[in-house]
């Protein structure tokens, strides 16, 4: 069932587990992630970046596809469609298209402008029953052209944004989009703890979930993280499985070139990755 992310994340924080946000890029990804969530009886958040939305022919197409799959696959677990790292304008476009959750990435604005824009979005999103995520402190790496240096957020700025009524908050704690470099210093749990102390029961979000050691993930959850974003790891798994299929010459055997067969190993690899993450996050049987 299609819902906002608010209640599932409140429940996750109270239950000391996290819900995974798995980004979708096409039909195969959407189907693999939805079916795995149903199998695992886990709530799930479908992340859609602005670039992925454009690739899939617009936000209306994304919503139509996900709604159709929920009906066609008889999906009964809670599902949110969430704009990932959205601009101010994109948030409104997604709300109009039927997204149930949006993230406003105002981390590149001065705190005063971030507060102003977030205040307006909170008012308009909540009027439609849509959940809203905000970000303080840019996440490292690149996400569809949005580049961050992996800085740590100012806990006081996090409180200022939290007090605006956002439903969950992404705070930079040294995390990075994409692959983590060998010299990565790890997550700043000191920052995360300080943010949680100031924001109370507000669910916190960890971006860049690919490659973070399991023990760090578990500690982050213990310090209030209730939503963890995963994208790169699914992409790598999909690419590796597809490469193996082609290099083994299976696309040349019979009708192995049929895209339904060609893309099947990649889809199975995504399902395996998603299930592993749901187990790690503790969300299995929490739907």
Where do the PLM segments sit?
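Alpha/beta enzyme core
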Residues: 3-11, 15, 27-52, 59-76, ...
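Conserved phosphate/anionic-ligand binding catalytic regions in large, soluble enzymes, centered on
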Residues: 22-26
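Glycine-rich beta-strand-to-loop/alpha-helix junction loops that act as flexible
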Residues: 206-210
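Short, flexible active-site recognition loops that position polar ligands and cofactors
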Residues: 255-271
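Metal-dependent phosphohydrolase cores
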Residues: 21, 199, 213, 259
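Glycine- and acidic
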Residues: 14-17, 259
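Active-site gating loops and adjacent loop-to-helix segments of metal-dependent hydrolytic enzymes
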Residues: 245-258
């Amino acid at each position: 069932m299609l819902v906002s992310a608010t209640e599932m994340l409140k429940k996750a924080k109270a239950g000391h587990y996290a819900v995974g946000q798995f980004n979708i890029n096409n039909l195969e990804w959407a189907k693999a992630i939805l079916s795995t969530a149903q199998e695992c009886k886990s709530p799930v958040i479908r992340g859609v970046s602005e670039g992925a939305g454009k690739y899939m022919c617009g936000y209306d197409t994304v919503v139509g596809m996900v709604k159709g799959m929920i009906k066609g696959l008889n999906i009964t677990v809670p599902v949110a469609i969430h704009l990932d790292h959205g601009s101010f304008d994109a948030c409104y476009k997604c709300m109009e298209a039927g997204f149930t959750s949006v993230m406003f990435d105002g981390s590149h604005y001065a705190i005063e402008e971030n507060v102003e824009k977030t205040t307006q979005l909170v008012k308009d999103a909540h009027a439609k029953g849509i959940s809203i995520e905000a970000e303080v402190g840019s996440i490292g790496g690149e996400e569809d052209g949005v580049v961050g240096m992996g800085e740590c957020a100012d806990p006081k700025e996090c409180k200022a944004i939290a007090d605006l009524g956002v439903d969950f908050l992404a705070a930079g704690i040294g995390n990075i989009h994409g692959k983590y470099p060998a010299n990565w210093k790890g997550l700043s749990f000191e920052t995360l703890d300080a943010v949680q102390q100031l924001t109370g029961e507000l669910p916190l979000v960890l971006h860049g979930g690919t490659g973070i050691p399991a023990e760090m993930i578990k500690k982050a959850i213990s310090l209030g993280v209730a939503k963890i974003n995963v994208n790169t790891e699914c992409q790598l798994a999909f690419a590796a499985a597809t490469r193996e299929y082609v290099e083994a010459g299976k696309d040349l055997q019979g009708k192995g070139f049929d895209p339904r067969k060609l893309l099947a190993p990649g889809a199975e690899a995504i399902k395996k990755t998603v299930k592993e993450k749901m187990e790690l996050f503790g969300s299995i049987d929490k739907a």
